[in-house]
């Protein structure tokens, strides 16, 4: 499920932002992608949104992943569109590995988690069991515009959760530290990667972001028939008719 090319795409995702709408189709299978609570989809009708999507889609495809969908904090998105803010800090994405779109995953969630742990062990010589301590230790080592893998953050029967941290000098001329938590799960026998991005503020940030990502995965499962309230969800969007159509997806 997680080839070296796909792992490289996970790292690449930490440095970019983009978007689409649902349901997506992976190898002809419809997958509903609910936006997180308080998040809105980017719109194809907005030129800034479209440029961002186009750029990110191309970057990810070169690394072996397909962008399925993305949303951002609704207020941040509104302010960004109107020029009140230059950057989006809180946003989410769904992706899938291109190589397995037309076939079942080659690994179970547990096997993928084992692969991610191995990658983490290569990068983190002495992986600290406490997540907060791991983040703080990594922060002292990474330099500006570097990304570091934080290893596996959690695992359950439905998903494997891992993280990245990056120090960025932004195009707005500011510096920020970004936390990325991602989940690897299987929906309708298709691999789906879910991402949460946020600014690192203190030791509590990683726990907060991980908790929100777990909620996103739960909503994803329910939306695709794996929960007591399973249904096709309504997306949060300022104008649903303007969101990117499923015809843009494979």
Give the positions of each predicted feature.
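Surface-exposed amphipathic alpha-helical segments
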Residues: 190-250
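Primarily extracytoplasmic ectodomains and periplasmic/lumenal surface modules that are beta-strand-rich
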Residues: 37-51
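Bacterial N-terminal signal peptides that target proteins for export
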Residues: 1-9
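Short N-terminal edge-element motif at the start of the domain
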Residues: 22-23, 48-49, 53, 57
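Short N-terminal segments immediately surrounding and downstream of signal-peptide cleavage
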Residues: 21-38
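Short, surface-exposed beta-strand/loop micro-motifs that present aromatic residues
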Residues: 176-187
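N-terminal signal peptide c-region/cleavage motif recognized by signal peptidases
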Residues: 14-16
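Conserved polar/disulfide-associated segments of primarily extracytoplasmic proteins
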Residues: 54-172
């Amino acid at each position: 499920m997680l080839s070296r090319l796909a792992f490289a795409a996970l790292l690449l995702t930490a440095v970019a932002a983009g978007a689409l709408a649902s349901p997506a189709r992976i190898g002809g299978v419809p997958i509903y992608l609910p936006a997180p609570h308080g998040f809105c989809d980017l719109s194809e009708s907005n030129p800034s949104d479209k440029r961002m999507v186009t750029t990110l889609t191309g970057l990810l495809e070169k690394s072996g992943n397909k962008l399925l969908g993305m949303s951002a904090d609704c207020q941040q998105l509104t302010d960004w569109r109107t020029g009140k803010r230059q950057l989006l800090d809180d946003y989410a994405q769904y992706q899938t590995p291109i190589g397995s779109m037309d076939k079942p995953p080659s690994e179970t969630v547990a096997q993928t988690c084992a692969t991610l742990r191995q990658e983490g062990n290569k990068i983190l010589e002495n992986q600290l069991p406490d997540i907060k301590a791991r983040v703080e230790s990594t922060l002292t080592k990474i330099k500006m515009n570097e990304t570091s893998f934080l290893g596996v953050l959690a695992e359950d029967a439905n998903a494997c959760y891992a993280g990245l941290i990056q120090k960025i000098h932004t195009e707005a001329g500011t510096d920020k530290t970004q936390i990325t938590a991602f989940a690897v799960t299987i929906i309708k026998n298709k691999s789906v990667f879910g991402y949460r991005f946020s600014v690192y503020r203190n030791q509590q940030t990683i726990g907060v972001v991980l908790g929100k990502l777990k909620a996103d995965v739960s909503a994803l499962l329910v939306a695709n028939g794996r929960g007591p309230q399973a249904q096709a969800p309504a997306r949060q969007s300022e104008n649903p008719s303007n969101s990117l159509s499923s015809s843009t997806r494979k």
